[in-house]
């Protein structure tokens, strides 16, 4: 089975009437995701027109939407200034799985949100992430559905576009994926590498794992230690930013080298010490996986 979501996951879209929310809601519906409703304050009672004559109701609040639809997941396409409140509203409404796509949420907001989400017992993916996709089952977020293939490789990444690149490499070489997860590149995120590694380790349909990290922080080193101690499946890793200069932010808010711990070389060395096969470039993934398996 996939991790975190499956073909029965019932999804709400917060911000469904906005430009991004409406576009990606239709994309998710076309993929086959069970989208059961949307939430936009002031638009309650209206309907959202999906592809092929389908439609779903729009609600004013998350509490109302969850009560009416029984949704067990939500995805957030809300502007940064309001996204923290949207996450907290979802957690307060009892949604167990929250995916925050929004980029640019202030770190101080997330410092307030993350403890609240944990207190409510919800799982948060993101923010500033592409979401996740279980090939042939469900898609939540912005990952393109046409590059995936059903299979047994779990993919977890801090980078959205690098996820797409590596998944494309796998699919074109007839290597399918069990679940592809983008955890996001902000300094404060919910679900992390270790959470995903643990889930993939427990998943009977995942035979090997691809982990894509980047410069900044020590999440990759922590994940490598977890792999060494707890993961028996083959793991292949890549670190983005191998030529990045220290002190300069590279794309993500969290992708900045501060001291030796955040460098690509330090992270790759931690991978090697944990028995993780290390890619020098994304196109190495196919050969390394085949060798590992």
Protein language model features and the residues they cover:
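Catalytic-core regions of core metabolic enzymes
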Residues: 1-293
């Amino acid at each position: 089975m996939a991790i975190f979501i499956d073909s029965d996951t019932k999804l709400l879209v917060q911000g469904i009437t906005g430009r991004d929310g409406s576009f990606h809601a239709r994309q998710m519906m076309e993929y086959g995701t069970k989208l059961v409703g949307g939430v936009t304050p002031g638009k309650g009672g209206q309907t959202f027109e999906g592809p092929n004559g389908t439609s779903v109701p729009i609600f004013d609040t998350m509490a109302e939407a969850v009560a009416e639809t029984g949704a067990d997941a939500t995805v957030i396409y809300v502007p940064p200034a309001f996204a923290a409140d949207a996450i907290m509203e979802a957690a307060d409404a009892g949604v167990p799985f929250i995916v925050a796509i929004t980029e640019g949420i202030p770190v101080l907001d997330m410092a307030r949100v993350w403890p609240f989400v944990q207190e409510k017992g919800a799982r948060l993916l993101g923010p500033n992430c592409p979401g996740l996709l279980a090939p042939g089952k469900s898609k939540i977020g912005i990952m393109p559905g046409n590059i995936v293939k059903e299979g047994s490789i779990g993919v977890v990444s801090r980078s959205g576009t690098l996820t797409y690149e590596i998944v494309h490499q796998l699919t074109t070489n007839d290597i399918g994926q069990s679940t592809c997860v983008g955890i996001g590149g902000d300094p404060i995120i919910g679900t992390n590498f270790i959470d995903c590694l643990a889930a993939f380790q427990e998943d009977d349909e995942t035979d090997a794992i691809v982990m894509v990290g980047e410069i900044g922080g020590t999440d990759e080193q922590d994940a490598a230690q977890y792999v060494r101690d707890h993961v028996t499946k083959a793991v292949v890793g890549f670190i983005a930013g191998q030529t990045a200069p220290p002190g300069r932010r590279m794309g993500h808010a969290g992708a900045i080298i501060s001291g030796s711990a955040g460098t690509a070389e330090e992270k790759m060395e931690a991978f090697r010490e944990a028995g993780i096969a290390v890619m020098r470039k994304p196109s190495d993934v196919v050969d390394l996986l085949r060798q590992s398996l």
